Curated annotation (Swiss-Prot):
Protein name as catalogued: Nucleoside ABC transporter permease protein NupB
Transmembrane feature ranges: 9-29, 77-99, 105-125, 138-158, 195-215, 244-264, 284-304, 326-346
Source taxonomy: Bacteria, Bacillati, Bacillota, Bacilli, Lactobacillales
Places the protein is found: Cell membrane
Cellular component terms per the entry's GO annotation: plasma membrane
GO molecular function, one term: transmembrane transporter activity
Length: 364
Protein backbone atom coordinates (compact mmCIF):
# COMPACT_ATOMS: atom_id res chain seq x y z
CA UNK A 1 0.00 0.00 0.00
CA UNK A 2 1.52 3.34 -1.06
CA UNK A 3 1.82 6.30 1.29
CA UNK A 4 -0.88 8.40 -0.42
CA UNK A 5 -3.48 5.65 -0.10
CA UNK A 6 -2.56 5.15 3.54
CA UNK A 7 -2.92 8.87 4.28
CA UNK A 8 -6.48 8.76 2.95
CA UNK A 9 -7.49 5.43 4.49
CA UNK A 10 -6.26 6.05 8.04
CA UNK A 11 -8.46 9.13 8.69
CA UNK A 12 -11.45 7.42 7.05
CA UNK A 13 -11.01 4.36 9.26
CA UNK A 14 -10.67 6.61 12.32
CA UNK A 15 -13.93 8.37 11.41
CA UNK A 16 -15.77 5.07 10.90
CA UNK A 17 -14.48 3.69 14.20
CA UNK A 18 -15.47 6.92 15.96
CA UNK A 19 -19.04 6.74 14.68
CA UNK A 20 -19.21 3.01 15.47
CA UNK A 21 -18.13 3.64 19.06
CA UNK A 22 -20.76 6.37 19.38
CA UNK A 23 -23.38 3.95 18.01
CA UNK A 24 -22.35 1.24 20.47
CA UNK A 25 -22.67 3.66 23.39
CA UNK A 26 -26.10 4.78 22.18
CA UNK A 27 -27.24 1.16 21.91
CA UNK A 28 -25.86 0.38 25.36
CA UNK A 29 -28.05 3.11 26.87
CA UNK A 30 -31.14 2.16 24.88
CA UNK A 31 -30.99 4.79 22.15
CA UNK A 32 -31.36 4.19 18.41
CA UNK A 33 -28.07 5.25 16.77
CA UNK A 34 -29.62 5.46 13.29
CA UNK A 35 -32.18 7.98 14.47
CA UNK A 36 -29.54 9.81 16.48
CA UNK A 37 -27.16 10.23 13.56
CA UNK A 38 -30.04 11.08 11.25
CA UNK A 39 -31.07 13.93 13.56
CA UNK A 40 -27.45 15.05 13.82
CA UNK A 41 -26.99 15.41 10.06
CA UNK A 42 -30.44 16.92 9.50
CA UNK A 43 -29.76 19.47 12.23
CA UNK A 44 -26.41 20.37 10.65
CA UNK A 45 -27.31 20.23 6.95
CA UNK A 46 -31.09 20.01 6.69
CA UNK A 47 -31.86 23.66 5.89
CA UNK A 48 -30.25 26.78 4.48
CA UNK A 49 -29.90 28.21 7.98
CA UNK A 50 -28.28 25.08 9.43
CA UNK A 51 -25.87 24.88 6.49
CA UNK A 52 -24.95 28.51 7.13
CA UNK A 53 -24.26 27.80 10.80
CA UNK A 54 -22.15 24.77 9.89
CA UNK A 55 -20.09 26.77 7.40
CA UNK A 56 -19.71 29.58 9.95
CA UNK A 57 -18.27 27.12 12.46
CA UNK A 58 -15.62 26.05 9.94
CA UNK A 59 -13.82 29.42 9.84
CA UNK A 60 -12.13 29.44 13.27
CA UNK A 61 -11.45 25.68 13.08
CA UNK A 62 -9.60 26.01 9.78
CA UNK A 63 -7.40 28.77 11.19
CA UNK A 64 -6.53 27.07 14.48
CA UNK A 65 -5.91 23.82 12.58
CA UNK A 66 -3.51 25.64 10.25
CA UNK A 67 -1.78 27.02 13.34
CA UNK A 68 -1.23 23.52 14.69
CA UNK A 69 -0.14 22.23 11.27
CA UNK A 70 2.56 24.89 10.82
CA UNK A 71 4.10 24.01 14.17
CA UNK A 72 3.87 20.27 13.50
CA UNK A 73 5.65 20.60 10.17
CA UNK A 74 8.63 22.16 11.92
CA UNK A 75 8.56 19.46 14.60
CA UNK A 76 6.80 21.41 17.38
CA UNK A 77 3.61 20.51 19.23
CA UNK A 78 1.66 23.75 19.63
CA UNK A 79 -1.08 23.31 22.24
CA UNK A 80 -1.37 27.07 22.71
CA UNK A 81 -3.98 27.84 20.05
CA UNK A 82 -6.62 28.58 22.69
CA UNK A 83 -4.48 31.25 24.34
CA UNK A 84 -3.30 32.63 21.00
CA UNK A 85 -6.89 32.84 19.71
CA UNK A 86 -8.01 34.48 22.95
CA UNK A 87 -5.24 37.08 22.62
CA UNK A 88 -6.35 37.86 19.08
CA UNK A 89 -10.00 38.06 20.07
CA UNK A 90 -9.68 40.35 23.11
CA UNK A 91 -7.10 42.71 21.59
CA UNK A 92 -9.01 43.28 18.36
CA UNK A 93 -12.31 43.58 20.21
CA UNK A 94 -10.87 46.21 22.54
CA UNK A 95 -9.72 48.23 19.54
CA UNK A 96 -13.03 47.94 17.67
CA UNK A 97 -15.07 48.99 20.71
CA UNK A 98 -12.71 51.84 21.58
CA UNK A 99 -12.82 53.30 18.04
CA UNK A 100 -16.31 52.38 16.78
CA UNK A 101 -16.53 55.08 14.10
CA UNK A 102 -13.68 53.89 11.90
CA UNK A 103 -15.01 53.14 8.37
CA UNK A 104 -15.70 49.47 7.64
CA UNK A 105 -13.15 49.24 4.81
CA UNK A 106 -10.45 50.29 7.28
CA UNK A 107 -11.85 48.62 10.40
CA UNK A 108 -11.89 45.05 9.06
CA UNK A 109 -8.21 44.99 8.00
CA UNK A 110 -7.16 46.70 11.24
CA UNK A 111 -8.86 44.20 13.56
CA UNK A 112 -7.44 41.33 11.49
CA UNK A 113 -3.91 42.75 11.74
CA UNK A 114 -4.21 43.50 15.47
CA UNK A 115 -5.50 40.01 16.24
CA UNK A 116 -2.74 38.39 14.22
CA UNK A 117 -0.03 40.53 15.87
CA UNK A 118 -1.11 39.65 19.40
CA UNK A 119 -1.56 35.99 18.46
CA UNK A 120 1.90 36.03 16.89
CA UNK A 121 3.37 37.44 20.10
CA UNK A 122 1.81 34.57 22.05
CA UNK A 123 3.45 32.18 19.59
CA UNK A 124 6.79 33.99 19.71
CA UNK A 125 7.25 33.36 23.45
CA UNK A 126 7.29 29.53 23.33
CA UNK A 127 9.13 29.67 20.01
CA UNK A 128 12.09 31.65 21.32
CA UNK A 129 12.17 29.67 24.58
CA UNK A 130 12.40 26.45 22.59
CA UNK A 131 14.96 27.76 20.11
CA UNK A 132 17.31 29.40 22.62
CA UNK A 133 16.80 27.44 25.83
CA UNK A 134 15.39 24.12 24.62
CA UNK A 135 12.28 24.60 26.78
CA UNK A 136 9.45 22.22 25.88
CA UNK A 137 6.86 24.04 23.79
CA UNK A 138 4.20 21.67 25.15
CA UNK A 139 4.70 22.98 28.68
CA UNK A 140 5.06 26.64 27.73
CA UNK A 141 2.02 26.69 25.43
CA UNK A 142 -0.17 24.99 28.03
CA UNK A 143 0.96 27.47 30.68
CA UNK A 144 0.40 30.41 28.33
CA UNK A 145 -3.16 29.21 27.72
CA UNK A 146 -3.88 29.65 31.41
CA UNK A 147 -1.95 32.91 31.67
CA UNK A 148 -3.95 34.39 28.78
CA UNK A 149 -7.21 33.03 30.17
CA UNK A 150 -6.78 34.74 33.54
CA UNK A 151 -5.17 37.86 32.07
CA UNK A 152 -8.16 38.33 29.74
CA UNK A 153 -10.46 38.19 32.77
CA UNK A 154 -8.28 40.80 34.50
CA UNK A 155 -8.40 42.97 31.39
CA UNK A 156 -12.17 43.03 31.08
CA UNK A 157 -12.64 43.59 34.83
CA UNK A 158 -9.93 46.19 35.40
CA UNK A 159 -8.59 47.61 32.13
CA UNK A 160 -11.56 48.00 29.79
CA UNK A 161 -13.32 51.37 29.77
CA UNK A 162 -16.72 51.28 31.45
CA UNK A 163 -18.42 52.72 28.38
CA UNK A 164 -17.59 49.62 26.29
CA UNK A 165 -18.89 47.14 28.87
CA UNK A 166 -22.41 45.76 28.89
CA UNK A 167 -24.65 47.56 31.38
CA UNK A 168 -24.66 46.16 34.93
CA UNK A 169 -21.90 43.63 34.26
CA UNK A 170 -18.13 43.45 33.95
CA UNK A 171 -18.11 40.00 32.34
CA UNK A 172 -18.87 41.01 28.77
CA UNK A 173 -18.57 43.97 26.45
CA UNK A 174 -21.20 45.70 24.40
CA UNK A 175 -21.81 44.45 20.88
CA UNK A 176 -19.55 45.77 18.16
CA UNK A 177 -20.85 48.29 15.66
CA UNK A 178 -22.07 47.15 12.25
CA UNK A 179 -18.95 48.51 10.54
CA UNK A 180 -16.78 46.11 12.59
CA UNK A 181 -18.93 42.99 12.24
CA UNK A 182 -17.87 40.25 9.84
CA UNK A 183 -21.52 39.50 9.08
CA UNK A 184 -22.95 40.71 5.79
CA UNK A 185 -26.52 41.10 4.61
CA UNK A 186 -26.03 38.99 1.48
CA UNK A 187 -24.55 36.03 3.35
CA UNK A 188 -27.22 36.25 6.02
CA UNK A 189 -30.10 36.41 3.52
CA UNK A 190 -28.58 33.61 1.45
CA UNK A 191 -28.68 31.28 4.47
CA UNK A 192 -31.98 32.32 6.07
CA UNK A 193 -30.48 34.73 8.65
CA UNK A 194 -27.71 32.42 9.85
CA UNK A 195 -24.48 33.77 11.38
CA UNK A 196 -22.44 32.86 8.27
CA UNK A 197 -19.91 35.63 7.73
CA UNK A 198 -16.80 36.66 5.81
CA UNK A 199 -14.70 34.83 8.40
CA UNK A 200 -15.07 31.69 6.28
CA UNK A 201 -13.73 33.54 3.24
CA UNK A 202 -10.79 34.83 5.30
CA UNK A 203 -10.09 31.29 6.53
CA UNK A 204 -10.14 29.85 2.99
CA UNK A 205 -7.80 32.61 1.77
CA UNK A 206 -5.43 31.75 4.65
CA UNK A 207 -5.72 28.08 3.70
CA UNK A 208 -4.71 28.79 0.10
CA UNK A 209 -1.83 31.04 1.17
CA UNK A 210 -0.47 28.41 3.56
CA UNK A 211 -0.80 25.72 0.88
CA UNK A 212 1.32 27.87 -1.44
CA UNK A 213 3.86 28.55 1.33
CA UNK A 214 4.14 24.85 2.16
CA UNK A 215 4.64 23.73 -1.44
CA UNK A 216 6.04 26.64 -3.46
CA UNK A 217 8.25 28.78 -1.22
CA UNK A 218 11.68 28.66 0.39
CA UNK A 219 10.11 29.16 3.82
CA UNK A 220 7.92 26.10 3.33
CA UNK A 221 10.94 24.03 2.32
CA UNK A 222 12.92 25.26 5.34
CA UNK A 223 10.06 24.45 7.72
CA UNK A 224 9.83 20.90 6.38
CA UNK A 225 13.61 20.46 6.38
CA UNK A 226 13.99 21.58 9.99
CA UNK A 227 11.07 19.38 10.97
CA UNK A 228 12.72 16.34 9.40
CA UNK A 229 16.26 16.95 10.65
CA UNK A 230 17.38 20.18 12.39
CA UNK A 231 21.06 19.19 12.40
CA UNK A 232 21.14 18.39 8.69
CA UNK A 233 19.30 21.66 8.01
CA UNK A 234 21.96 23.62 9.89
CA UNK A 235 24.64 21.84 7.88
CA UNK A 236 22.82 22.87 4.68
CA UNK A 237 22.80 26.52 5.77
CA UNK A 238 19.27 26.73 7.19
CA UNK A 239 19.04 28.35 10.62
CA UNK A 240 16.97 25.88 12.65
CA UNK A 241 16.50 28.38 15.51
CA UNK A 242 15.24 31.12 13.22
CA UNK A 243 12.90 28.71 11.46
CA UNK A 244 11.52 27.40 14.77
CA UNK A 245 10.80 30.91 16.02
CA UNK A 246 9.30 32.05 12.71
CA UNK A 247 7.08 28.97 12.51
CA UNK A 248 5.67 29.60 15.98
CA UNK A 249 5.10 33.26 15.13
CA UNK A 250 3.15 32.25 12.01
CA UNK A 251 1.26 29.62 14.01
CA UNK A 252 0.34 32.19 16.66
CA UNK A 253 -0.77 34.69 14.03
CA UNK A 254 -3.09 32.12 12.43
CA UNK A 255 -4.60 31.18 15.78
CA UNK A 256 -4.99 34.87 16.64
CA UNK A 257 -6.83 35.34 13.35
CA UNK A 258 -9.04 32.41 14.34
CA UNK A 259 -9.93 34.31 17.52
CA UNK A 260 -10.80 37.40 15.48
CA UNK A 261 -13.06 35.39 13.16
CA UNK A 262 -14.74 33.78 16.17
CA UNK A 263 -15.27 37.10 17.93
CA UNK A 264 -16.31 39.31 15.03
CA UNK A 265 -18.13 36.65 13.05
CA UNK A 266 -19.99 34.66 15.66
CA UNK A 267 -19.89 36.28 19.12
CA UNK A 268 -20.01 39.98 18.12
CA UNK A 269 -18.53 40.98 21.50
CA UNK A 270 -16.07 39.73 24.10
CA UNK A 271 -17.22 37.55 26.98
CA UNK A 272 -15.04 36.67 29.96
CA UNK A 273 -14.04 33.01 29.66
CA UNK A 274 -14.00 30.47 32.49
CA UNK A 275 -12.15 27.83 30.45
CA UNK A 276 -9.88 27.65 27.41
CA UNK A 277 -11.52 28.26 24.04
CA UNK A 278 -12.84 25.11 22.38
CA UNK A 279 -11.70 26.29 18.96
CA UNK A 280 -8.10 25.72 20.02
CA UNK A 281 -8.48 22.10 20.98
CA UNK A 282 -10.89 21.30 18.15
CA UNK A 283 -8.38 22.89 15.78
CA UNK A 284 -5.78 20.40 16.97
CA UNK A 285 -8.18 17.55 16.23
CA UNK A 286 -8.98 18.96 12.79
CA UNK A 287 -5.29 19.20 11.91
CA UNK A 288 -4.58 15.66 13.09
CA UNK A 289 -7.53 14.25 11.16
CA UNK A 290 -6.54 16.24 8.07
CA UNK A 291 -2.96 15.02 8.24
CA UNK A 292 -1.74 18.63 8.65
CA UNK A 293 -2.38 19.24 4.95
CA UNK A 294 -4.48 22.24 3.80
CA UNK A 295 -6.95 20.13 1.77
CA UNK A 296 -7.26 17.60 4.59
CA UNK A 297 -7.87 20.40 7.08
CA UNK A 298 -10.68 21.78 4.91
CA UNK A 299 -12.61 18.49 4.89
CA UNK A 300 -11.83 17.70 8.53
CA UNK A 301 -13.09 21.15 9.55
CA UNK A 302 -16.33 20.46 7.69
CA UNK A 303 -16.79 17.16 9.55
CA UNK A 304 -16.16 18.68 12.97
CA UNK A 305 -18.44 21.61 12.13
CA UNK A 306 -21.22 19.17 11.24
CA UNK A 307 -20.68 17.36 14.54
CA UNK A 308 -20.75 20.57 16.57
CA UNK A 309 -23.70 22.17 14.80
CA UNK A 310 -25.73 18.97 14.60
CA UNK A 311 -25.20 17.75 18.17
CA UNK A 312 -28.17 19.63 19.69
CA UNK A 313 -30.48 17.98 17.15
CA UNK A 314 -29.89 14.58 18.76
CA UNK A 315 -32.00 15.67 21.71
CA UNK A 316 -35.06 15.25 19.46
CA UNK A 317 -34.81 11.53 20.24
CA UNK A 318 -33.76 12.10 23.83
CA UNK A 319 -30.10 11.36 23.05
CA UNK A 320 -27.64 13.48 25.05
CA UNK A 321 -25.66 15.74 22.68
CA UNK A 322 -22.56 14.83 24.70
CA UNK A 323 -22.52 11.60 22.66
CA UNK A 324 -21.05 13.69 19.84
CA UNK A 325 -18.14 14.59 22.11
CA UNK A 326 -17.55 10.85 22.56
CA UNK A 327 -17.52 10.43 18.77
CA UNK A 328 -15.12 13.36 18.43
CA UNK A 329 -12.83 12.01 21.15
CA UNK A 330 -12.90 8.55 19.58
CA UNK A 331 -11.90 9.94 16.18
CA UNK A 332 -8.98 11.78 17.79
CA UNK A 333 -8.01 8.63 19.68
CA UNK A 334 -7.94 6.49 16.55
CA UNK A 335 -5.95 9.16 14.71
CA UNK A 336 -3.49 9.30 17.62
CA UNK A 337 -2.92 5.55 17.39
CA UNK A 338 -2.94 5.55 13.60
CA UNK A 339 0.37 3.73 13.55
CA UNK A 340 -1.55 0.69 14.82
CA UNK A 341 -3.96 1.01 11.92
CA UNK A 342 -1.08 1.57 9.53
CA UNK A 343 0.56 -1.64 10.77
CA UNK A 344 -2.70 -3.60 10.64
CA UNK A 345 -3.53 -2.65 7.05
CA UNK A 346 -0.31 -3.97 5.46
CA UNK A 347 -0.51 -7.12 7.59
CA UNK A 348 -4.10 -7.77 6.52
CA UNK A 349 -3.10 -7.28 2.91
CA UNK A 350 -0.14 -9.64 3.35
CA UNK A 351 -2.38 -12.31 4.92
CA UNK A 352 -4.84 -12.05 2.02
CA UNK A 353 -2.01 -12.29 -0.49
CA UNK A 354 -0.62 -15.33 1.33
CA UNK A 355 -4.02 -17.03 1.36
CA UNK A 356 -4.48 -16.30 -2.34
CA UNK A 357 -1.07 -17.80 -3.09
CA UNK A 358 -1.93 -20.94 -1.11
CA UNK A 359 -5.21 -21.36 -2.96
CA UNK A 360 -3.45 -21.03 -6.29
CA UNK A 361 -0.91 -23.64 -5.18
CA UNK A 362 -3.67 -26.04 -4.09
CA UNK A 363 -5.46 -25.64 -7.42
CA UNK A 364 -2.24 -26.32 -9.26
Amino acid sequence: MNNKTRKVLVPLIAIVFGFLLGAIIMLAFGYNPIWGYEDLFISALGSARSIGETLQTMGPLILTALSFAVAMKVGLFNIGMSGQALAGWISSMWFALSFPDIPRLLMIPLVVIIGMVFGAFMGFIPGILRALLGTSEVITTIMLNYIMLFFSTFMIHSMFQKNILMDNTTDQTKLISANASFRTNWMSSLTDNSTLNIGLIIAIIALVIMAIIFTKTTLGFEIKAVGLNPDASEYAGISAKRTLILSMVVAGALAGLGGVVYGFGYMQNFVSQSASLDIGFYGMAVALLGGNSPIGILFAALLFSVLQTGAPGMTNDGIPPEIVKVVTAAIIFFIAVKFIIEVMLPKAKAIKASEATKKKGEKA
